[in-house]
């Protein structure tokens, strides 16, 4: 449409210029013909009228041509502006058409991008799970390392405590061995003292028996020193079973019980026991039997003395009369102790 309008404007312009040229040519021909006619018989009035009429027509045509030229220039400028504007529009339309043609490819690329984004999301989720697993593994490794450190510390602590325990046991064993040696030494001393005491008592009884011919215990002789406690301790040692001396608590209980029993037995072997002992009397044997017993007792006493010197823990040989006295005294003490226990139980129940 614009091209046809431009072609028309160009054709009008060409026609206008060709018309102006033809008018100029005609005016020249008219001048030439006037000159020719003037030579013949010029009529100045008619020529003047024709000239004025042609000049007026020419002036009007020239003015119209100028107006048309100006209007054509305006139209040409507007047409140029319109052509530039429409050229821009056409370029934009072409670009829009190209973009519209590229829409399917863009949609395909967009679908590919969405698929790749979905794959990336899945990969990110998987990576997150792997990172969580790695974090758990790192925590487990830290925990195992901490456990190893703690176990090493515990082993070192156990070793130190075991060494301390071994040292403490060694000290206790040494102390216990020393106490056992001291106790054995004291027991040996007590046994020797008791043996000496019984030998003296036996010699006195034998002298009385040989001089009088009979043996009657009138009263209980007073013990020399702390012989009552020694007798009770030896009797208890003879009655008790063997214990494991490695146990310190059992040793303490044994020593405490021995001291308490000594304290209990020493006051009880007083006038009450002497009443029971005073009633004991022995029948007088014959002279042959007496000599036989004396020889046997002397041999046994010498044997026991030699054994005590070698071993230090063998029991002392006693006479029959002394055994009877000790047994009766112990029986009386046991009866009184049982009665006191019963009374204590009754008192505790009443309380």
Curated annotation (Swiss-Prot):
Keywords: Coiled coil, Cytoplasm, Cytoplasmic vesicle, Endoplasmic reticulum, Endosome, Membrane, Nucleus, Synapse. It comes from the Eukaryota. Residues 106-179 form a coiled coil. Residues 295-306 have a biased composition (Low complexity). It comes from Gallus gallus (Chicken). One of its GO terms (cellular component) is axon cytoplasm. Residues 291-325 are annotated as: Disordered. Its main location: cytoplasm. It is found in: Cytoplasm; Cytoplasmic vesicle membrane; Cytoplasmic vesicle, Secretory vesicle, Synaptic vesicle membrane; Endosome membrane. This is Dysbindin. PANTHER family: DYSBINDIN, DYSTROBREVIN BINDING PROTEIN 1 DYSBINDIN. The keyword Ribonucleoprotein does not apply. It is a peripheral membrane protein. GO terms for biological process: actin cytoskeleton organization; anterograde axonal transport; anterograde synaptic vesicle transport; neuron projection development; neuron projection morphogenesis; platelet dense granule organization; positive regulation of neurotransmitter secretion; regulation of dopamine receptor signaling pathway. Component of the BLOC-1 complex, a complex that is required for normal biogenesis of lysosome-related organelles (LRO), such as platelet dense granules and melanosomes. Plays a role in intracellular vesicle trafficking. Plays a role in synaptic vesicle trafficking and in neurotransmitter release. May be required for normal dopamine homeostasis in the cerebral cortex, hippocampus, and hypothalamus. Plays a role in the regulation of cell surface exposure of DRD2. Contributes to the regulation of dopamine signaling. May play a role in actin cytoskeleton reorganization and neurite outgrowth. Pfam families: Dysbindin.
